C-alpha cells in the first residue's frame, strides 16, 4: 500500500515537469511579413509559403484567421509538424502586453518569428522591439479553443 502514494507523487511530479517544459522566458522574437490579411489567410500562398501549409492550409478560414501567425523554433515545446497549429500566449515582459498566436511556420533563430501585422506590433506597445529589431518575450503553449 505504501507504493501507491509514491506512484501518485511521481505522476504529479511528471505532470508538473511536462507543464513547465511548455513555456520559456526571455526568448528572442523577431518579426516576419506574412501579411495574412493581404494573402487571404492562405498558408500556401506564394508570398507566405508557411511550413505548416502542408497540414493546415485546408483548414477553414475561421481557423486560419482566428489568431495572428508565428514561426516557432523556441527552446521549449515540440518542433516541426508537431508544433503546427498549436497556440502560444506571447508576452512582452517590458510592457505586460500579451497576445495569442498560432504556429504556422518554423524558423531558425532559436525563438519566435512573429507576424508583423497580427502579433509583433500588438505587443511592441512601446516601440522598443521595432527599434532593436527584436523583442525578448515569454511564451507558453495554450489551448487554441478551436
From Swiss-Prot:
Activity regulation: Inhibited by 5'-ADP.
SUPFAM superfamilies listed in its UniProt record: Barwin-like endoglucanases
Residues spanning the signal sequence: 1-21
Keywords carried by this UniProt record: Antimicrobial, Disulfide bond, Fungicide, Hydrolase, Hypersensitive response, Nuclease, Pathogenesis-related protein, Plant defense, Pyrrolidone carboxylic acid, Signal
Outcome following mutation: residue 32 to G: Loss of antifungal activity. Reduces ribonuclease activity 60%
Cystine pairs: 52-84, 73-107, 87-144
Any one of the GO BP annotations: defense response to bacterium
Modified residues (Pyrrolidone carboxylic acid): 22
Induction: Up-regulated by fungal infection, salicylic acid (SA), benzo (1,2,3) thiodiazole-7-carbothioic acid S-methyl ester (BTH), methyl jasmonate (MeJA) and wounding.
Its EC number(s): 3.1.-.-
Domain Barwin span(s) in chain numbering: 22-146
Enzyme class: hydrolase
InterPro entries per record: Barwin_CS, Barwin_dom, PR4, RlpA-like_sf
Molecular functions per Gene Ontology: RNA nuclease activity
Subunit structure: Monomer.
Function in brief: Shows antifungal activity towards B.cinerea and towards the wheat-specific pathogenic fungi F.culmorum and F.graminearum (groups 1 and 2). Has ribonuclease activity.
Protein name: Wheatwin-1
Lineage: Eukaryota, Viridiplantae, Streptophyta, Embryophyta, Tracheophyta
Designated gene of the protein: PR4A
